[in-house]
Amino acid sequence: MSLLPSPQEVVLSSPMEGLLTLKGKPLTGVKIERKLSWYEKSESVEDFVITDNMGHFSLPIVRKTIKLSGLVHFSISQEINTTHNGDKILIWFMSKSSKIEFGELGGKPVNLRCELSSDEIITRDYNNPFMSRCKWDSLEPWSDSE
């Protein structure tokens, strides 16, 4: 990688499909907001989806061409929230350092379930700080090169 900034297409956020629940019951018609930021939050992309009548949601992949150099550590802040009874609830927070699809966890989460009444799980298992109210059964292997 060059020390001078050059444009590169990167995956800011992999697609995410799952089920949003509260005390085990699907939350329907609920807005899920995603904010992706980089360069110390001076640049960002924001979008949202609404859960369907079964509580399912599908956030699409977000790709963007950004200028990168060898002098700057690549890191994307991923924040996913919803609001319930007037309270903003953090569902997912991660600092993504991989530029590829499904680089967040090293694979595609299978059977992703996000339970608003659960405690936040905080871990460093995926090379970066990670907080989530979501669980999954397994990670579907995914390979790509950076």
Residue spans of the language-model regions?
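Feature of secretome-associated and extracellular-like proteins
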Residues: 1-9, 41, 69-146
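Charged, amphipathic alpha-helical segments
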Residues: 1-2, 56-70
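A short, Gly/Thr-enriched small/hydrophobic beta-strand-prone motif that recurs across taxa
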Residues: 9-21
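Glycine-centered loop-to-beta-strand initiation motif
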Residues: 18, 45-63
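A short, structured loop/turn motif at beta-sheet edges
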Residues: 21-28, 50-54, 82-87
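Short, ordered, surface-exposed loop/turn motifs in non-cytosolic proteins
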Residues: 25-37
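A short, sequence-level motif marking secondary-structure junctions
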Residues: 34-35, 53-54, 64-65, 93-99
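Short aromatic-acidic-glycine turn motif
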Residues: 38-45
